[in-house]
């Protein structure tokens, strides 16, 4: 009986692992690197709050996000590198250096039938979250980025901050239909 139970549990576990993870979360500390994490952790320990929870996560990674046209990488190029695996120019979001659209890991997850959500503490049209759904040569094209958001087919978007499109949206048909929701 014990052997049969063990075999059944092993089969269920193998089945669960064969399907892949149920959820995948990608946390991006925009502009944050190892020295910032070390400093914050040391501060937290000395303050008496213990180590940072993010340092206890089972899996962590760092990535090198080099811009294709500058020694200093901006958020748009960095987000594109993380999301799409391709180096691009500063200010470009979700496109390669020639302006050709790239597709992010989030698009491939959606195509594979997964639910996809983008959540950010900054506006949802900011370069970092936009790197996962937008295709623009100018990170400042927040109206175009918001159109890409609507076309993405993703399941959830949530962002913070004041809507940077407010002044451009007034007079647009969708603004008249929705009105001020804030």
Q: Language-model features: where?
A:
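Short helix-onset patch at the extreme N-terminus, typifying the N->h transition
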Residues: 6-8, 59
């Amino acid at each position: 009986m014990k052997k049969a139970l063990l075999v059944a549990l092993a089969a269920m576990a193998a089945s669960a692992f064969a399907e892949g993870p149920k959820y995948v979360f990608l946390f991006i500390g925009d502009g944050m690197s190892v020295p910032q994490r070390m400093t914050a952790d040391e501060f937290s320990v000395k303050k008496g709050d213990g180590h940072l929870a993010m340092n206890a996560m089972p899996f962590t990674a760092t990535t090198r996000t080099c811009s294709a046209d500058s020694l200093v990488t901006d958020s748009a190029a960095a987000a594109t590198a993380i999301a799409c695996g391709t180096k691009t120019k500063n200010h470009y979001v979700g496109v390669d250096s020639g302006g050709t659209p790239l597709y992010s890991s989030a698009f491939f997850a959606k195509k594979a039938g997964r639910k996809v959500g983008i959540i950010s503490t900054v506006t949802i049209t900011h370069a970092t979250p936009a790197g996962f759904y937008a295709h623009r040569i100018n990170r400042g094209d927040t109206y175009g980025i918001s159109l890409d958001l609507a076309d993405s087919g993703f399941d959830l978007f949530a962002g913070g901050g004041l809507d940077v499109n407010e002044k451009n949206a007034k007079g647009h048909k969708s603004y008249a239909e929705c009105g001020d929701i804030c």
